[in-house]
């Protein structure tokens, strides 16, 4: 059974409360439960992790290489400025799919650039929680191609 790590960054623990007009009413717990169920139907074991701390996310990315076949990552606001997370992704050999609930390219100009996307296998934005499922499908396809 393939193992995948789902990492959600800062403020995503506030889903369902924070800016529901942008992120929707669903909670992180709902998202994680739905993703685990979807992964199970695909024969994938999914572990979920959320942190508001850059170092904790970096540590988890480093550890993932020896445990998981791939990572689905929503770096939150770190997307736009964390060269440390970018370098952590670049330092591992497993594929990472970047996902965002909202379309970062339609929002404030400071959100348009992702410093992490260039070292990811791909980026999925703007499809709400469904984007996470798309990321899982894409990751599984990437692993089949390898």
Swiss-Prot record:
InterPro entries found in the cross-reference section: DHquinase_II, DHquinase_II_CS, DHquinase_II_sf
Coiled coil: none
Binding site for substrate: 74, 80, 87, 101-102, 111
Pathway where this protein functions: Metabolic intermediate biosynthesis; chorismate biosynthesis; chorismate from D-erythrose 4-phosphate and phosphoenolpyruvate: step 3/7
An individual GO BP term: amino acid biosynthetic process
Pfam families named in the record: DHquinase_II
EC class (word): lyase
Active site per UniProt: 23, 100
Record's keyword terms, sorted: Amino-acid biosynthesis, Aromatic amino acid biosynthesis, Lyase
Any one GO molecular function term: 3-dehydroquinate dehydratase activity
EC number annotated for this UniProt entry: 4.2.1.10
Site annotation Transition state stabilizer: residues: 18
Reaction(s) catalysed by this chain's protein: 3-dehydroquinate = 3-dehydroshikimate + H2O
Family: Belongs to the type-II 3-dehydroquinase family.
Its biological purpose: Catalyzes a trans-dehydration via an enolate intermediate.
Subunit composition and interactions: Homododecamer.
Protein name per UniProt: 3-dehydroquinate dehydratase
Protein species of origin: Bacillus cereus (strain AH187)
Source organism phylogeny: Bacteria, Bacillati, Bacillota, Bacilli, Bacillales
